[in-house]
Amino acid sequence: LDKFSINVPGDPSSAAFFTALTLLKKNSYLKIKKVGLNPTRIGFYSLLKKSGAKITFSNKKKVNNELVGDVIVKSSSLRPINASKKYYLNTTDEYPILFVISALIKGNSFFSGISDLKNKESDRIKEMQKILKQIGVLSKFKNGKLLIKGKKIEKNITKKINVPNLGDHRICMSAAILGLLTGSEVRIKNFETVGTSSPNFLKIVKQLGGSFEKKNL
């Protein structure tokens, strides 16, 4: 995967996956146009900025009484993430990709008050733990708090990541981004579920230089 610059229009939850890719890939840049900047929608970005992410908002204006603007993301050297339970409601959908980011930051990241993630389209805590373990990243969940023992991966690790048929679009996309960042081969069953929220996901991946093929697994 080469360094890249790209503009992605639209939804902040869908763009979160490419935000992760941008932050962790050297010399990369992302611009997301016309994003809703209501404080209840941008917990993901606020949390990452606390960890050193180079994320800024520009061209802000009110549209139908809602704040809208462009989100600009640049490659960053991130510190481990410490997400208290107050972030849960504003960041619910983005936790799987936050777990991926944490896995690739050297040090311990903590996520508190996230027990409800066990009751989404899949048990997102358990399933992401399984995925991260396949690249050698350990984690522990206890009393509503997840610890991820991240490690910085400098070179392609050429691992194989297998994701079963969970029917969970956010797990699928998170695993795909993990594969792009680590050089791993990822096999994801029922990837079609991604179309429910991000029908252009694979198209954008291809534009960035990623490769994929569809098989009957």
What are these regions (language model features)?
Residues 1-217:
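Short, structured segments at the rim of ligand-binding sites
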